[in-house]
Amino acid sequence: MFYLVGLPDSTVKESHQRIISALQVNGYRMPTSNIVINMAPADIRKEGSAYDLPLAIGMLAASETIQSNELSHYLLMGELSLDGSLQPIKGSLPIAIKARELGFEGMIVPRQNAREAAVVNNLK
């Protein structure tokens, strides 16, 4: 079970089922301990399903199911489907611009968003 704190909207709150289903379909098990995810800063509303992928990967990394040594270099965004697939998101270009401004090496986004995000120079 995991809990989201930090002003998530209803779509972000609903990510719970998408993440659990996607992880299970892809052969991962949810950690057995309770997980609290702090989406800081708490005063800024988090909207949309694009947080699904980073939340899922963060949980896998925190539980040491996957190695996380390179994750901090990349910004991850994407919606997870109940069937475990990665779905496109809105706004990948402005997200990519911000990722470059913040010094990320690259972005991991759904294939359908790759061309738009690739417009930004100096970002893998």
Predicted regions and their residues:
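Peripheral, non-AAA+ core regions of ATP-driven protein-machinery
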Residues: 1-124
